[in-house]
């Protein structure tokens, strides 16, 4: 990817692109409090392996398997303790990256428990680290559902916050509940365009990271997101017609655009909210769980 000119970044559970502790040391408990030097060595190795590439360095600290770190280290039993450790480790990772490249761009995901810590004032970050806010997997900028717990905490910076902000937005999502993973998002293009206009209004315009999965089923939505990034506001209906003309040709562009609009209109609703529309995982995975 780097050889093709792409900028590299990292999953939020794998800061700095480093090897997971559980993979490097499968016989050890994945606890920073016990093995700080081993964690630091893995981070430094990740930096060294990518030091000649174009990288947006993702920094942060989650547990192994993409879960809260205190699931593995229960001594961190208060928000104050959890926020203090994550803040200190982010600063340490930031300093390691900047020692290699003083102009390096760093980001961190405000996702799940980290968003709660940040909003409650327990997470402190270097000023120029881009804070990445995530949608819920269905295009709405609120916290994601965890099984049947769905608090829908707003996931955008406050108006007037001039520090660096971006988003992690799902054109494709995987939750083994109701997500659209191998089929197009079940919410309308107009809904997505409005959400992204709101993102820009809140100042989250420094960095957009888009989960596009295997691309093909999500091509129209990716085109819409790209236009929102470039132009700020988009007429979703006109974008759909322009997309179908470019992708399928001029002859039947309006009929195809209507089919694409109808796809979202007739999606199965599974809840009371405007984004509660089921995708392919609802049909594939939920019956398996019931059986």
Which role does the model predict for each range below?
Residues 1-3, 28-162, 268, 275-276, ...:
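Gly/Pro-rich turn-and-neighbor structural signature
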Residues 20-22, 65-71, 161-189:
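Active-site clefts of carbohydrate-active enzymes
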Residues 131, 199, 211, 243:
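Conserved, mostly hydrophobic/aromatic
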Residues 182-210, 224-229:
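Catalytic-core region of carbohydrate-active enzymes that cleave or remodel glycosidic bonds
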Residues 237-291:
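C-terminal non-catalytic alpha-helical accessory regions
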